[in-house]
Amino acid sequence: MSAHNPPRLVNLAAMSLLRDEALAIWSLEYLPMELYPPLFMAAFSLRRSETMMAMVQTWPFARLPLGGLMKKPHQETLEAVLDGLDVLLAQKVQPRKCKLRVLDLRNTGQDFWNMWSGDKYHVTSSSLMASVAKDMPRTKHPLAPLEMYVDLCLKENTWGKCITYLFTWVEQRKGSIHLCCKKMKIVSRSRETIKKVFRIVKLDCIQEVDLNFTQKLSSLAKFAPLLGKMRNVQKLLLSPIHGSSFTSQVEVTYHSGFPELITCFLSFSSRCLKIPLYNISITNCLLTELDLTHLSQSPKICQLKGLNLSGVTLTNFCPKLIQGLLEKVADTLEELNLNLCGITDPLLTALVPALSCCSQLRVFSICGNLISMAVLQSLLRHTDGLSALRLEFYPAPRESYSSLGILNQERLAQLKAELWQLLTDLGHPRKIWIKKTRILFLCLRCHLDQNLCET
């Protein structure tokens, strides 16, 4: 602590009080609520588990943002706080002083601790303070379930002792604790892992889901009803895990089962979700026209802002299906990613009218597709009226590749100059990115082989 930033008297008092932990615990009954945060921070810093356990039982605020103090999971601290909750849960009537209803383990609440530590320069919102430290009337009825908030990013074999301990603790007290997870990411090869997480977490609290999985993916269709119970989901990402250990045969088996999961989820989501979906990301998967029909007909996409279908092969889809989907979300869509979708000139030409109606579109990317210079120029002309468009990513035009699929840098530079001139002639400030990709070589070879067969 420097001379320019001396410790506050209240912080010094908290440190002094903790020299005698028994005295500190005894004094909690008489401690003003304003002194609780500084004392808890001191107890956390000095790892005074008994004091933290006792403070949880008399916490005078509605929320304890523990995650804002723990930069990394600390099992001893977590155990102390959960032991304090156990004492609370064992009581039939809420203690007079305790107002605690929410334990927040997310990386939030820094403003709360900054305010009570006197670090006013890092307090960003007084309204946030009110919501974190809001007082609540004491109930004389049996305690309602306590809520515990956590953002989960679970990778197989990397759960760690803290998350394992937390899950076991919550599962044993499921009737008294609601584990609420607004953001969830699971990377797993195991159905049992996913099943266990879904069994413990309160599903209707989830707002963002990022599910990465592999092996025998057709069996994941069994989880579609669980996904359907996530009634407040706003952002959904379903992605495969590609590893070097997989053969192409395994990947085909994986992809063949995936549409069943998508179809089931879209069907369930249409009936079960309480609020609209704001973001959908379905990548590197094989979808059917039935899946796309379910998606375009779902009433839950009426306010969709983000759509990512990168890696989903759209080559043989009926253009009207994709066109209908874009038309339905044209008034709200802000970000559209169609990278590596096997899009060629005929399909993109059919989609241009629908794309030009996406008035809120800010980000548009179709990299890794085989598009000619003429169609790319037509697309730029038709989207010139989209005033919100800020980021545009396009593939190098097909003409910049040789007959062997080798990129001709000189030809690419010439085509870029023509595109820049087109943008200048259109008269609106606009910046686009032209990207090269190796995947395009495979698309080009298929295109050349097809032309060769036709001739």
Regions flagged by a language model, labelled:
Residues 1-215, 221:
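N-terminal adaptor-interaction module of cullin-RING ubiquitin ligase components
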Residues 2, 75, 84-87, 117-123, ...:
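C-terminal capping region of solenoid repeat domains
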Residues 7, 11, 33-41, 50, ...:
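Amphipathic alpha-helical interface elements that mediate macromolecular binding in regulatory proteins
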Residues 19-23, 33, 48, 110-113, ...:
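Short, solvent-exposed loop/turn at the beta-strand->alpha-helix junction
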Residues 19-56, 321-324, 334-342, 346-368:
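Extended amphipathic alpha-helical scaffold segments
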Residues 62-81, 230, 235-240, 245-248, ...:
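Long amphipathic alpha-helical scaffold regions
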Residues 64-67, 98, 103-106, 148, ...:
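Conserved hydrophobic beta-strand positions in leucine-rich repeat
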Residues 196-201, 221-230, 247-276, 292-301, ...:
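A structural signal for leucine-rich repeat
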